[in-house]
């Protein structure tokens, strides 16, 4: 690491003692007078401090493309870059956006990643990670609103979209239940268990007990495969059949068991496994 230059009162020295961006906006947007005796002083600055024009012009061009042509004109990393403009206002966010996509594979992967993993990407601090998770939460709530107070079976694509957004990028298995009333309208959406990377414990008695507590007459089982492959295991199929039998004794219908992966989903009913 290069040794920091000592502070000096000479007008010929640059007023920066670090390679990190300066917090004061005036150093970026104010008209700092140049020392006429040091015409090359600006060139000696690190690229990150060489003035706003090296990325602010790019920001405006990117905004214009989005404004005029919509999201189809931008790559995923550029959409993320646009968002990061506001979260990290005085820094070139293009490398950060690309690093996030490279690390997590896609936009949905970025927003589905835990905050702790987001902060492992250079340039992403705790506040930025929190903001990204907040945006992710807004998206989840929006998708959930599409199935709330509606007949779930007639809004099946919305159900799949919501479950995928909520679970596809979880790093551990999660078992979720959608509880429905006699009109198949959503009563509650609850996570019943969280497990390891390849297993989560499920207790049929607890599933049925909770359905009775909510006066649900039907349920949809959902769980994720962190590996990304939604293919059901023998254990998945057997466990589903046990829950179906336990629920049937109390006139509760199990409509389906959906398995969510990063790139798709599987319906056990669709595969005629139940």
Curated annotation (Swiss-Prot):
CDD domains: MPN_DUF2466. GO terms for molecular function: metal ion binding; metallopeptidase activity. Residues 1-57 are annotated as: Disordered. A motif (JAMM motif) lies at residues 223-236. GO terms for biological process: proteolysis. Keywords: Hydrolase, Metal-binding, Metalloprotease, Protease, Zinc. It comes from the Bacteria. It holds the Pfam family RadC. Residues 152-274 form the MPN domain. InterPro entries: MPN, RadC_JAB, RuvA_2-like, UPF0758, UPF0758_CS. Zn(2+) binds at residues 223, 225, 236. NCBIfam families: PRK00024.1 (NF000642), radc (TIGR00608). Belongs to the UPF0758 family. This is UPF0758 protein RHECIAT_CH0001935. It comes from Rhizobium etli (strain CIAT 652).
């Amino acid at each position: 690491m290069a040794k920091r230059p000592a502070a000096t009162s000479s007008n010929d020295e640059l007023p920066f003692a670090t390679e990190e961006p300066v917090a004061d906006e005036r150093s970026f947007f104010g008209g700092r007078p140049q020392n006429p005796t040091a015409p090359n002083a600006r060139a000696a600055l690190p690229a990150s401090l060489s003035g706003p024009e090296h990325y602010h012009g790019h920001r405006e061009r990117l905004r214009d493309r989005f404004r005029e042509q919509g999201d189809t004109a931008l790559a995923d990393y550029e959409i993320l870059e646009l968002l990061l403009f506001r979260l990290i206002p005085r820094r070139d966010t293009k490398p950060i956006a690309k690093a996030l996509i490279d690390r997590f594979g896609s936009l949905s992967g970025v927003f589905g990643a835990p905050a702790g993993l987001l902060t492992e990407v250079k340039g992403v601090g705790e506040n930025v990670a929190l903001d990204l998770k907040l945006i992710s939460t807004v998206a989840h709530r929006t998708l959930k609103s599409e199935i709330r107070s509606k007949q779930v079976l007639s809004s099946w694509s919305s159900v799949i979209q919501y479950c995928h957004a909520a679970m596809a990028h979880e790093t551990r298995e999660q078992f979720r239940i959608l509880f429905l009333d006699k009109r198949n309208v959503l009563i509650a959406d609850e996570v019943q268990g969280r497990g390891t990377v390849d297993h989560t414990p499920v207790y049929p008695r607890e599933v049925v007990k909770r359905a009775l507590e909510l006066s649900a007459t039907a349920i949809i089982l959902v769980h994720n495969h962190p590996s990304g492959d939604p293919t059901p295991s023998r254990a998945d199929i057997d466990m589903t059949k046990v829950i179906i039998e336990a629920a049937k004794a109390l006139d509760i219908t199990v409509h389906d068991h959906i398995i969510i992966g990063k790139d798709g989903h599987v319906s056990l009913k669709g595969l005629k496994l139940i």
